[in-house]
């Protein structure tokens, strides 16, 4: 049984390009982001991979990435489940602010703490711990059972929601996951054993 799980962060969004805190705001992909998503699909197809089900967030940039990946793989119309449990970390009052402007307004050290600490949230927003607490129940209840049934599964989501999955799959500490950067449009492949432990993990690169 092939217990395949592939994670891919959405391609570059319009707000990534503008260096804005995005969170639950809903910009679309840039042309580069579209290219990144298509490249991810082409890389997965070149590996001879296929999927039985895809999961994505409620946000356009992730859904569009998922659609483009599947198109490149010849899987248009694949069963795709969108849920806000997989949304990006909510940056609250920082959402829509340029990151340099936020540093000027709140101070560089404070913004660094909000971005890079595990359990401190910006005003009105989520910490990474909050994001993990939102994402993991959905993973355990919905996505993981799919994988363990042998359904080859794609998850197209966001840097921080995917960090939550990487954290549990790779058994990383909060400190370890904070150091982990996930590139846009770069697939990560996992194969799981019957006990849900990772038997294979690799980055799929050009």
Curated annotation (Swiss-Prot):
Gene Ontology terms for molecular function? phosphoglycerate mutase activity
List, alphabetically, the InterPro entries matched: His_Pase_superF_clade-1 (IPR013078), His_PPase_superfam (IPR029033), PG/BPGM_mutase_AS (IPR001345), Phosphogly_mut1 (IPR005952)
Key words of the record: Gluconeogenesis, Glycolysis, Isomerase
Tell me the route in metabolism or biology where this protein functions: Carbohydrate degradation; glycolysis; pyruvate from D-glyceraldehyde 3-phosphate: step 3/5
PANTHER family the record matches = PHOSPHOGLYCERATE MUTASE
NCBIfam families from the xrefs? Answer: pgm_1 (TIGR01258), PRK01295.1 (NF002339)
The name of this protein is 2,3-bisphosphoglycerate-dependent phosphoglycerate mutase
Look up and give the organism this protein is from: Azorhizobium caulinodans (strain ATCC 43989 / DSM 5975 / JCM 20966 / LMG 6465 / NBRC 14845 / NCIMB 13405 / ORS 571)
